[in-house]
Curated annotation (Swiss-Prot):
<dbReference type="InterPro" id="IPR007689">
    <property type="entry name" value="AalphaY_mating_typ-dep-bd-dom"/>
</dbReference>
<dbReference type="GO" id="GO:0000981">
    <property type="term" value="F:DNA-binding transcription factor activity, RNA polymerase II-specific"/>
</dbReference>
<feature type="region of interest" description="Disordered">
    <location>
        <begin position="625"/>
        <end position="734"/>
    </location>
</feature>
<protein>
    <recommendedName>
        <fullName>Mating-type protein A-alpha Y3</fullName>
    </recommendedName>
</protein>
<feature type="compositionally biased region" description="Basic and acidic residues">
    <location>
        <begin position="267"/>
        <end position="281"/>
    </location>
</feature>
<feature type="DNA-binding region" description="Homeobox">
    <location>
        <begin position="147"/>
        <end position="206"/>
    </location>
</feature>
<feature type="region of interest" description="Disordered">
    <location>
        <begin position="424"/>
        <end position="452"/>
    </location>
</feature>
<keyword id="KW-0238">DNA-binding</keyword>
<dbReference type="InterPro" id="IPR009057">
    <property type="entry name" value="Homeodomain-like_sf"/>
</dbReference>
<feature type="compositionally biased region" description="Low complexity">
    <location>
        <begin position="699"/>
        <end position="724"/>
    </location>
</feature>
<dbReference type="InterPro" id="IPR017970">
    <property type="entry name" value="Homeobox_CS"/>
</dbReference>
<feature type="compositionally biased region" description="Basic and acidic residues">
    <location>
        <begin position="326"/>
        <end position="338"/>
    </location>
</feature>
<feature type="region of interest" description="Disordered">
    <location>
        <begin position="308"/>
        <end position="374"/>
    </location>
</feature>
<feature type="compositionally biased region" description="Low complexity">
    <location>
        <begin position="669"/>
        <end position="687"/>
    </location>
</feature>
<dbReference type="Pfam" id="PF00046">
    <property type="entry name" value="Homeodomain"/>
</dbReference>
<feature type="region of interest" description="Disordered">
    <location>
        <begin position="238"/>
        <end position="281"/>
    </location>
</feature>
<dbReference type="Pfam" id="PF04611">
    <property type="entry name" value="AalphaY_MDB"/>
</dbReference>
């Protein structure tokens, strides 16, 4: 490119040099060709004003406006015609003859384009004029107020009906107001305003019913009868109305016509009563006829009902039937009330010859009882998610019209149309051999419980659009899939069929064919025996499983037979040239001939999700159940807290009572341990006994027994005392060991332990064994328990010994404690270490005790078995300590108890540290 540019610059420079050289030699430039001076143009066409006038007139434009519009259009076209002629004549002088035809065509095009634009603007004048006139009329109507909408008439004869309804419900629902408006012939707004005004004028509490409540029909009939009695004197004819209250000569026979009375008087005296009774019947029949003639209104219906109940005499059966036929125009019934069951008379047995023969089983009628549609929410949710794992954007259910699908062939007509018609209807089918995608779980619409006040159970977000749902799968046979398509709804144009001999090879179509053949193999796996399946098909099936069709889905396919679930996940087909309903029998051939076009949309297209309301309902039920469980758990925790608070208050009250009685005060650690032991004992007791079979304990014994020192060493003492071991304390809790200062009885003198005091302090079990000699258990290394891990490391060490009573107690008191190691081992009395209140910790050496066990010291290798090499833990009196073990491999050295020394915390009464402890040549560092 750079070389070409340099070459062009050189050529331009050479041309300029040649031109300057020619001018210097006296050469003259070539003159320009002179244009045509006498160019004549054809006249431009004039606009058709007559046709424009007819079109404006037909559009409804007034003559004056039409004339002005056409005039303006004609003037504009004339000005534009003269302008174009002048401009093109000036331009034609500089145009060569060979380009003249281009100039003429350009002149005609410029003129016609502008004229056509003005013509379109003129044709828009009628619409603009109509819009402007409508706006002006609206403005005039709004400002002058000359037009008033006729006010709807209020039918006052239906006021008693509204008042009767107001007596039961002052706040009707929209469905009730609409029903009342239809019955009374008024607008819903009128009914709403009437109830608003009536509520404003009413006094006292107003009745309000829920939409699902029932109207008490007995009370309704009673109120209707009372209203009829009140309105009866007003609506009766003049000769049947009762006399005024001020008239003294008023009599029941006053309203009877004179001719009827004279006829009655002419009878014999014995028949006076019979004649009067007949005359009264006739008068009442006339009143009933009058009321029946006016029964088109509510008051007429009320009067008719009141007149029918007026006669006291018994009517015949014909009269009763006629009275039943007089139905009311406005009738309020309880829609939820079940029909009254008639008493069934037992049929008498017929002779054997008269019993009809039941040939085809018609006598055994199926039960018409509807089963409950309630399902387990978890099962519903699991089944719906298994059938449709991916949420569908088409979350509404539709029902296909009867005439929208017509099958072309008879073999698949019934099966396919039955599947299509089941969309959006009924409950989920229990038949697992059918396709779950063709059944809907949406229940039918429920009927209203009172005046159609209930709304439909599901709200559909949008109507069904066939263009957004291009395809529906349905399994016609095991190896045949039918595709319901609509070419016009997809936006495909009609395509002409290719020749039969023409073959099209495409990589996408071949891949699609192979995938469909794989699906066919998958369907054929369960339809044919495994022995007949070829090795190629088995390999294809294994590859399908590796591609994502898992064993669970194959098992589901085995249950629901060969449906289109896997095919829908794999490929999607659209048939542009196919009729509305087509069955693709040979899919590979159809793909090769392009009878079926593969569609690869941006998102997977599926049919409308029949299970969407099903899944939503199941999720809603699951959430509701979770909320209930959470609420129940919260209530349970609240009850536990309340019970714990009551128990603590009861325990505090008991402690105050013991303190007033002079009993020793317990420390918080003892209180915690006693509560833990009581909780454990309660838990163990509930499994052995029921609450009703428990015997009440003595309050003093139970309160004192809960305060005794818990046992950590002796199993026999736990059995004798009847108390269970307390729970193991955590790292941040103190050990349940009781110091001697907790047993101060209020005096400085020694207290002699008597059986009564022993029973108060430690329970009746220990008091009963007070006089018995104590068995010397003897201290042995068995109280120190060692355990090793799998790799030979020291797992843990548990010291099952009891803390001594450290304090100012006498030897006699120590001898009575069955858990005291001093008296049980028959050792010399060790002087108790006095704890100074100012010192935090003190150290006690147990060297005087350990030589007693020198002869019974076990071998280290027997205790551990292998060389310790890892980090372990040691548990001493409920406390856990981490130890790093390491050293030589000499494990034959005996365990020397003389090197064990413990450090005690005086305030917490627990072990806090070990000193250097060589265990078999292994140093123990804490």
């Amino acid at each position: 490119m750079v070389d070409r540019l340099k070459l062009l610059q050189a050529i331009s420079t050479s041309a300029k040099d040649l031109a300057s050289f020619a001018l210097s030699r006296g050469a003259s430039p070539i003159p320009q060709p002179v244009g045509l001076t006498d160019v004549t143009f054809d006249p431009l066409p004039l606009p058709d004003l007559n046709a424009l006038h007819r079109r404006l007139k037909d559009a409804g434009l007034p003559p004056k406006t039409t004339k002005s519009a056409i005039k303006a259009y004609d003037e504009a076209c004339s000005r534009w015609r003269s302008t174009v002629d002048e401009s093109f004549k000036a331009t034609a002088s500089a145009v060569s003859p060979r380009n003249l035809h281009l100039l003429l065509s350009l002149r005609h095009h410029v003129y016609a384009q502008q004229v056509q634009k003005w013509l379109w603007q003129v044709l828009q004048v009628p619409e603009l004029w109509k819009a402007e006139m409508a706006k002006q009329r609206a403005h005039i109507t709004a400002t002058m107020d000359t037009y008033k909408k006729p006010r709807p008439k209020f039918h006052s004869e239906y006021t008693p009906l509204l008042e009767l309804y107001f007596h039961f419900n002052a706040y009707p629902t929209f469905a009730d107001r609409r029903m009342l408006a239809e019955k009374t012939g008024m607008q819903t707004r009128q009914i709403t305003v009437w109830f608003q005004n009536h509520r404003r004028r009413a006094k006292g509490p107003l009745p309000r019913m829920a939409p699902t409540d029932k109207i008490p029909m007995e009370e309704f009939e009673r109120q209707r009868e009372n209203m009829a009695r009140k309105l009866l004197p007003v609506l009766l004819p003049s000769h049947l109305r009762p006399a005024p209250s001020g008239s003294e000569n008023a009599s029941p026979a006053r309203s009877i016509p004179r001719a009827t009375m004279s006829a009655a008087k002419s009878k014999k005296p014995d028949g006076d009563k019979e004649a009067l009774r007949k005359v009264g019947k006739k008068a009442l029949r006339d009143a009933a006829k009058t009321a029946k003639a006016n029964s088109s209104t509510v008051l007429g219906a009320l009067v008719a009902a009141g007149v029918q109940q007026a006669p006291e005499a018994k009517n015949s059966k014909k009269a009763k039937k006629a009275a039943r036929k007089n139905a009311q125009d406005v009738e309020m019934r309880d829609a939820t009330k079940s029909h009254e069951k008639r008493r069934k008379t037992k049929a008498m047995p017929r002779p054997a010859g008269q019993v009809p023969m039941d040939v085809d089983g018609r006598a055994h009628k199926k039960s018409t009882k509807t089963t409950s549609s309630a399902f387990d929410s978890k099962a519903e949710l699991a089944f719906a998610r298994m059938a449709y794992p991916a949420p569908s954007p088409y979350a509404w259910v539709h029902t296909a019209p009867k005439s929208s699908h017509v099958m072309p062939s008879a073999p698949f007509k019934d099966a396919h149309i039955s599947d299509i018609r089941k969309l959006g209807k009924g409950k989920p089918s229990q038949n697992l051999t059918s396709t779950p995608a063709t059944f809907s779980t949406v229940p039918p619409r429920r009927t209203s419980s009172r005046l159609n006040a209930m709304r439909p159970p599901y709200a559909f977000p949008a109507t069904y659009d066939s263009a957004s749902v291009p395809m529906t799968f349905a399994a016609a046979q095991t190896l045949r899939f039918s595709f319901v398509t609509d070419s016009q709804a997809f936006g495909f144009r009609q395509r002409y069929p290719l020749s039969v001999g023409e073959k099209v090879h495409s990589g996408a179509i071949d891949a699609l064919t192979r995938r469909f053949e794989s699906l066919r193999v998958l369907c054929a796996e369960f339809s044919t025996p495994k022995k007949q399946t070829s090795s190629f098909e088995r390999q294809t099936l294994c590859r399908l499983r590796a591609e994502g069709l898992k064993a669970g889905e194959i098992e589901v396919r085995h249950l629901v037979a060969a449906d289109s679930y896997a095919a829908r996940r794999a490929i999607t087909y659209v048939t542009p040239r196919a009729p509305l309903d087509s069955v693709v029998v040979d899919l590979p051939r159809a793909l090769q001939l392009r009878l079926v076009k593969p569609l690869v949309p941006a998102e997977p297209i599926v049919r409308p999700d029949d299970f969407a309301p099903f899944v939503a309902l199941a999720e809603k039920r699951a959430k509701r159940r979770a909320r209930k469980e959470k609420k129940k758990q919260a209530e349970k925790e609240a009850r536990k807290e309340e019970k714990r608070a009551r128990k603590e208050a009861k325990q505090a009250k008991k402690d105050r009572k013991e303190q007033r009685a002079g009993l020793p005060r317990r420390s918080p650690s003892t209180l915690d341990s006693s509560r833990a032991s009581s909780v454990t004992s309660d838990a163990s007791a509930t499994s052995r006994k029921s609450r009703t079979s428990r015997k009440p304990r003595d309050s003093s014994a139970s309160s004192v027994a809960s305060a005794r020192t818990p046992s950590l060493s002796s199993t026999s003492s736990r059995r004798s005392s009847g108390t269970s071991m307390p729970a193991t304390p955590r790292m941040n809790e103190s050990l349940p060991v009781v110091a001697s200062d907790n047993f101060v009885l209020g005096t400085d003198k020694d207290v002699t332990m008597t059986p009564e005091l022993m029973a108060q302090l430690f329970g009746e079990d220990d008091a009963s064994g007070l006089d018995e000699p104590m068995q010397s258990e003897g201290f042995s290394p068995d109280m120190l328990i060692f355990s090793s891990c799998n790799d030979g490391a020291l797992g843990d060490m548990t010291a099952d010994v009891n803390m001594p009573e450290l304090g100012d107690l006498s030897d006699t008191q120590l001898s009575f404690d069955d858990m005291n190691w001093t008296s049980s081992m028959d050792l010399s009395t060790q002087p108790a270490a006095s704890f100074d209140s100012s010192s935090e910790t003190s150290s006690m050496d147990f060297n005087w005790l350990l030589p007693q066990c020198a002869n019974t010291a076990p071998d280290w290798s027997a205790l551990i078995g292998m060389t310790p090499s890892t980090t372990s833990q040691i548990h001493v009196l409920g406390g856990t300590y981490s130890c790093e073990l390491g050293g030589t491999n000499t494990t034959n050295a005996p365990l020397n108890f003389a090197d064990l020394s413990f450090e005690l915390d005086a305030g917490e009464d627990c072990f806090i540290n070990f000193d250097h402890n060589p265990l078999g040549g292994t140093m123990l560092a804490v």
